[in-house]
Structures are given as structure tokens and as C-alpha cells.
Amino acid sequence: MRKLARICIICVLALVVLALIPALINGNFQSEPDTTIPPEIDQNALIADASAYFERMCKGDFSTFHEALPSGIKSQTTPEDIKSAWGEEAHKMGVSPSLDTATVTLYRPEFSNQLRVEFSIPGEKGDFCFFINYTLEGSLYNYVVWVH
């Protein structure tokens, strides 16, 4: 029993250290992570940009979004890959993605140098979530189909 307790304590300490690594690397020792959106970012324009991509994908056009991705991301995926991941997750959640039913949120994730526009649509089996990430300067960075 004591050995199990020690292992649990070591695991918890390891998780704490892993959580602190980004702060140590960035020299950010604040107790709270920086989640502020830079004031020079036009939040409405960023949401409109992401929403236009999302709406096109809802209508089946994944090529336009793929072409806009940075070359490093674009070379790792295809429009068909994005469409496939999108379709699988939408089917699994029992939802037909639509901008009209999406809750759209712009935020800066903790310990991140990115801005995220999140599209969340409630489904029969959970929420379908699609993230479009931008750099802190407002350039398209990447995307994530949230897999449950």
C-alpha cells in the first residue's frame, strides 16, 4: 500500500512538472497563464474569417480552407483528410455541422501562442467541435477536429 501511495505521489509530481514546462521554457513564471488577446487583433474580423472557412466546409468545400493553410501544415494533409475527419466526427456525434447552429468563441488557450476560433455544435451523442487556430499576429495557423 505504501508503495502504491509513493507511485501516486510521484505521478502527481510528474504531472505538475509537465504542466510547468511551457512556463519554464517561455520564462513565464506568472501564477496565471497569459490568455489575453493582443489589442491589435480585430476580433470580429478574425471570427468572420474563420466563420467563412467553416461555412464553406459545412457546404462541402474543404479545398479553399486547405489552400489557405500554411505550407508546413498543408503538406501534411489534404482536403480529403480534413473532410474525412470532419465527417467521421460529425457522424459519431450525430450532428450535421452548420454555422447557424454553431456556438462560435474566440479565445487564447492557456500557455499558447495561438488564438483559437472554436465552433461547437451540440449533437445527439456529444458536441461536434472544430477549432481554427491563428498566430498571435492573426495569420491562419492550423485546425483541429476535436475527437471524442
What are these regions (language model features)?
Residues 101-148:
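Exposed beta-sheet edge and beta->alpha loop/turn motif
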Residues 1-14:
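N-terminal Sec-pathway targeting helices
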Residues 36-40, 51-55, 68-75, 118-120:
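Second-shell loop/turn segments in exported
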Residues 14-26:
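Hydrophobic alpha-helical membrane-insertion segments, chiefly the h-region
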